[in-house]
Amino acid sequence: MLEFLRKKKIQVPDNYKNLIGQSDYEIFVNQCLNVLKDLGVNVISYENGDITYKGKNEDGHYFLDNLVRKYVQVDKENQLTEIKDHFKKLQETPYAYDYLFKDFDYAKQFLKVLIKPTDITPKIDDFVTRIDYPDLLTVLVLDFEDRFHYIRKDEAILWEVDFEELFKIALVNISQENVEIRKHLFDDKFDVYVLLSGDFSASFSLLIDTHMDFAIGEYGSLIGIPTKGTVFIHPITTNDFMDLTSTLYNEMERFYNEDPSNISMDLYWFDKKVLKLFNKTWNDNGTITISMPDELKKIVNE
């Protein structure tokens, strides 16, 4: 184990706890560090799913959220191989990003956004992000060579393009992704549109006002984004739509616990302009009470 870890206990990040136990996570992190050492990577620190290493010109980061989800899905005898393959692939094009940040006209085709929990890394302020869903981050990334590169602010400024313009371009690219939209009837009464894709359903939901007007009801939309690849949207047209939340929450929970790329168990209201959070209360008996935002409650009861 590296010297800095001898003084600091490895803890499972909260957003990994439904995937992996404490002892297995310690094994996982140590395997990652040993593989990186064998590859000649100069690791500086580890914290909360983020391995910081000494790069050519500045410190770099390996975020473990995708790797840990792949790791737990393979047989134990193949887990170390999964780690080796992952980090070897990251070493194959170490200088490609230097070129991308020097040629915006070429790089812009790879711009995308991902929706992520706010605790994805303790150093998230170093990266280009914005907030669309309350309590979540919209993160600007390069989708290049079958991996996502989280774009740091010091990298993005090399393009000399306003950050909001970068997000606009990224969302145009997201609109070109192949996202399947299925219409289901929940509780024999409520229309629910389910967005399915490998990586970009949650990101695609940000385009609801321009690409999914059919999913917007008189009172807006009820949205759940349990994982990056699965989104639930109900067009709110009646004042009894809260009857849907129990069934919807249970369905979201199933995806959240089974899918390797979970995001949130919160529900959101798209009010035809912005996204707002439904209230959630944990009761003493272990149940959860979900209630409408005050603004929504007012308009549906008029």
Please report, for each region that a protein language model flagged, where it lies by residue:
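Conserved catalytic core of nucleotide polymerization and phosphodiester-bond processing enzymes
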Residues: L19, S23, D50, V274
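Aromatic/basic-lined ligand-recognition segments
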Residues: V179, K189-A215, Y219
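Charged, alpha-helical interface segments at or near domain boundaries
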Residues: Q31-V35, L39, I44-G198
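Short beta-strand
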Residues: V43-Y46, L222-P226
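N-terminal alpha-helical "arm" segments
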Residues: M1-S45
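Short glycine-rich, basic-tinged beta-strand/loop micro-motifs
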Residues: I10-N15, D50-I51, F190, I225-P235
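C-terminal structured domains
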Residues: T227-E302
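Well-ordered, non-membrane alpha-helical segments in soluble/globular domains
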Residues: D24-V29, S201-D213, F241-E253
